[in-house]
Structures are given as C-alpha cells and as structure tokens.
C-alpha cells in the first residue's frame, strides 16, 4: 500500500491548512487518485493494523439498507456511535440511498439491485452508477455522505470500480473506505461472474486532521508489508445474502495499531 503512504507524504508536503466543520483543523489537498489492481492482493493497509471485522460488518449493514446502528452494536462495531441519536438512528444515510432512493411518485429505487442487473444485461453501459448524494435528503442525515458516488466498468471480462469521495479523513477513514469498496467490487464481480479488475479511488477534499500528524509521521516510518488475500468462501444467491462468515482474510501481518481521535 505504498500508494497510501505516498498520499500522506503529498498532503504533508503540498497541502494547505484549512478550518473544517469539526473545528479540529486539517492539512488538505484537492483532487487525488489511486489505483489498486485487485488481482494482486487485497488493498488493506499494512503499516498499521486495520479492523477488517468492522469493515465487513459495516458493508453488510449498508447492503441491508439499514440506517439504525443496532446491527452494528450487536456485532461490536462502534464506528457510527458518535453520529447516532438516542435511538440509534442516523437518518437516510448510505443504506437508505443504496437500497431505497425515494422517487417523486412515492416509490423507491434499489440502486444495488439495479446496477447488478445492468452489469449483467449491459456490461458496456456508462450508467453503472450508485449515488448516496441525495441533495433532497442531506439535511435529514446525521452525516452527509463522504464516499458519495461510485461507478462500475466492465472490460475484458473484468469488473472495475471507481469511487468519488468528496471528503476524506486520510489517517482514520481512508483505509476503511478502500477496503470496503474493494470488497464490494469482489462481491459484485462474483455475482456477475466476472474477474477482478481495478479499484480506483478519487478524492475531493483529501485531508489529514491536525491531531493526526504525530500518528501520520509514525506510520510513514514503517515499511509496507505484502498485501493480504481476501477469499469469498461461497457464492450466495444474491448480493444481499452474504454473511460475515463468508469472508476469509489471510496473510495479513500488519504493523501494530495506531490510536487516533475521531473528529466529530
């Protein structure tokens, strides 16, 4: 994951200091892209230990269309706790937009089912897109979507995915985002009987928080290790039938975890 370390170096060297919604302060660049060949290993950061269990459960939670953190809490995942209300609700965040985007007629669009059907029927379509950025519902969300928009691309029997992330917490959030969308691409590829292509990550406001600088320097002092392997152990009937036990991560030997505060 040298690409990830190179991004950190780029922000430290070329970034500008900015204020932000949380009041923490950031060093930021605008517009950055990384590409990961998914056939060459699973892109999970190795210069610190990442909690893959949380990443998998969060993705399954998105795919369920849920917006209450009860499922996450049941599985000891706390990454959304700071934003939930007293009942555990987050408003119409990712899961709602992915699975039930509201229409003017009062119906809802299941974007995940729709895009998989499109990939199977029209793999050369340039409309293989899922969006979480629903302008009409942003004010109802506990947190506006950071990873806002993704597009699939099929060529030579391989499935690739590009994510546009409008706002990116590089130290804490980005390793989760890369791994999550890489895994989603693997799942969709399996459902569509396609081989793996690339995961392309594109960032808008791409930043390091001012209280993550010491941790960033520590991480940059570490040498990346070989990428792990992610295996999907079975092919369920649909994208919505995967269980946590269907995923096996092997050969992951990261450097120790680095603790850092979350900017809320």
Curated annotation (Swiss-Prot):
Keywords (A to Z) from UniProt: Cytoplasm, Methyltransferase, Nucleotide biosynthesis, Transferase
The protein's Enzyme Commission number: 2.1.1.45
Pfam family of the protein (one): Thymidylat_synt
Recorded GO CC terms: cytosol
Biological-process GO terms, alphabetical: dTMP biosynthetic process; dTTP biosynthetic process; methylation
Sequence positions that bind dUMP: 21, 126-127, 166-169, 177, 207-209
Subcellular localization, as worded in the UniProt entry: Cytoplasm
Gene3D superfamilies: Thymidylate synthase/dCMP hydroxymethylase domain
Keyword Lipid metabolism in record: no
Reactions catalysed: dUMP + (6R)-5,10-methylene-5,6,7,8-tetrahydrofolate = 7,8-dihydrofolate + dTMP
Positions annotated to bind (6R)-5,10-methylene-5,6,7,8-tetrahydrofolate: 51, 169, 263
InterPro entries tied to this protein: Thymidate_synth/dCMP_Mease, Thymidate_synth/dCMP_Mease_dom, Thymidate_synth/dCMP_Mease_sf, Thymidylate_synthase, Thymidylate_synthase_AS
Main location: cytoplasm
One Gene Ontology molecular-function label: thymidylate synthase activity
Active site residues per record: 146
Pathway(s) it belongs to: Pyrimidine metabolism; dTTP biosynthesis
Alphabetized PANTHER family for the sequence: THYMIDYLATE SYNTHASE, THYMIDYLATE SYNTHASE 1
Family statement drawn from the similarity comment of this UniProt entry: Belongs to the thymidylate synthase family. Bacterial-type ThyA subfamily.
Physiological role: Catalyzes the reductive methylation of 2'-deoxyuridine-5'-monophosphate (dUMP) to 2'-deoxythymidine-5'-monophosphate (dTMP) while utilizing 5,10-methylenetetrahydrofolate (mTHF) as the methyl donor and reductant in the reaction, yielding dihydrofolate (DHF) as a by-product. This enzymatic reaction provides an intracellular de novo source of dTMP, an essential precursor for DNA biosynthesis.
Subunit structure, as described in the record: Homodimer.
Protein name listed in UniProt: Thymidylate synthase
Source organism of the structure: Shewanella sp. (strain W3-18-1)
Gene that specifies this protein: thyA
